[in-house]
């Protein structure tokens, strides 16, 4: 039963092929489906019940954007699996994104979340996004209520979650960040979210994997169809382009009402507006996004569409009787010379659309016009608690854009959807539902880095054939990058939308499934996350006691002679700050200080600023033109990048670390004022260069061994 439910939930998440403009009937069905899922979630998912944590509705009480402010909290839902957990393991959070969290639950058992939790002895978590599923901060979806649905508020939710979470049944462990490593995973919109979280809250999140992450908000996202045009089966693409030519030549260029009427009647859509008609015809090609390597969850519509429109046989006897009308339409659309070839293709398209769409509409008691219409001002004005469809349009109308048009394609490109699908049409929902008449303020998203976003332990995994690729760091317009363990940058060939996310149970695998490229990518993700865990350091904010967390729990254990210096305390609750301990003999303090100082010198030599990146809100300032790194390269930050650490900042970081070491081993009772500098210097210690990083690790191990007599435990 659990496996069947998991399959169904994944199927729902995968096969929802989105038209450029979602018809009202689908918006209504989406709200009903969400309500039903929330109502029966506890029964269906008994193995993984929903839990809640109270989150502030408003994280920014000083911002005028959210006036009037509120101090209230709401229940945000999450699910977790601790079956792989061992003390010291990380918390792996899969960000729920712009959908109900129920659709992500199968990833607790199979897929990348389960794999990472198993590889690191961690806890797998699914965290729902505010205003989706059952995580509703407000009693309705009115504009006034939706003012709290913004990117920055959603990011702050996740940060609050990680700093305050207490998992039921695991209360004896302190599993909050940053004491426990919290690592994020997200796909698509959620992929953008986790990338932003790593750069905006680097002191909370130890790492993140952004899969098919959209980090660049684009208002007119005509590029959505470029990977389809370039990567989908070319015979299918060519036939689709011919159909689009015919439709646009008749409706846009021909302006003959009789021919337009005959074209629409051929498809049984005579009463639809022109743009709604063109939108309905795009339902086949837009199914590309829902394809997946796993046949059990892959959308079937795309390949059914392609198989039928590329056939030279008449597959539907009923539509074959309309040859005369279809031939006139082909000729009026400028493809008369190709009529013998296009005729069966066009009539098969008519038959396919009737079978895949119109029969479904009639089965629901709707006419084609009711089913495919996107104009209904009365519907759009509804904003009660049942109108959950309003959440994502609110986000893209205000901040993200992503209006998928055919009109935006350059003139030298034969589009795969009609140019009738333009900005006025795709933005109509913004105007009718929310009264928004201006383009989305994409700067509110792009300020986080857009194409240039980059950070230590921030991985990007994309599909080479993903329609959303052009909105992420692998876009044609983005700069080229290399890949490393510290900054993985992976493009999966012939993969579509976050194909690395789902997986199979062991008894479901075959020689062909998962495909080798998927197995390799998921294995690589597990590898570099384990490597990230090896250098996890946390200096306790309250006690400044370094807590070793993770190394002995990895599959590749440390040598036995190293472990005595890395024994984790059972609890830090009553730990005594090393700065408050009085050494029994002053010589111990002196030798400890000297040893710690020597380790800092070693680290300073090995870890000089080769491409350092400072955490956000750190001590670094804009480097002057005279500043160069030790390789003689100019230190100047790229647009959108975190500020490059200057030599001065690096020296300050090491000085603060040295002062911390001194105060920890001598008699200074209060070093609260040094807390910020110490925490910042810890990040500066770590170079992007693997050899230097190794040297850093050795220097801290050296310090740990020197200070064993003082019971100072260092976490690496």
UniProtKB/Swiss-Prot annotation:
The GO terms describing molecular function are:
carboxypeptidase activity; dipeptidyl-peptidase activity; serine-type exopeptidase activity
Enzyme Commission number, as recorded:
3.4.-.-
Residues of the active site: 188 (charge relay system), 466 (charge relay system)
Give the signal peptide, or none.
1-17
Provide the GO biological process annotations. proteolysis
Sorted alphabetically, the keyword list is:
Carboxypeptidase, Glycoprotein, Hydrolase, Membrane, Protease, Secreted, Signal, Transmembrane, Transmembrane helix
Query: Is Glycoprotein tagged as a keyword?
Result: yes
Q: Name one GO cellular component term.
A: membrane
Its membrane topology is listed as: Single-pass membrane protein
Spell out the InterPro entries in the cross-references. AB_hydrolase_fold (IPR029058), Peptidase_S28 (IPR008758)
**Which enzyme class, named as a word?**
hydrolase
Q: Where is this region: Disordered?
A: 617-636
Q: SUPFAM superfamilies under this entry?
A: alpha/beta-Hydrolases
Cellular localisation: Membrane; Secreted
Glycosylation, residue list = 143, 174, 258, 354, 507, 550
Q: Which residues cross the membrane?
A: 652-672
Which family is annotated?
Answer: Belongs to the peptidase S28 family.
Q: What is this protein called?
A: Probable extracellular serine carboxypeptidase
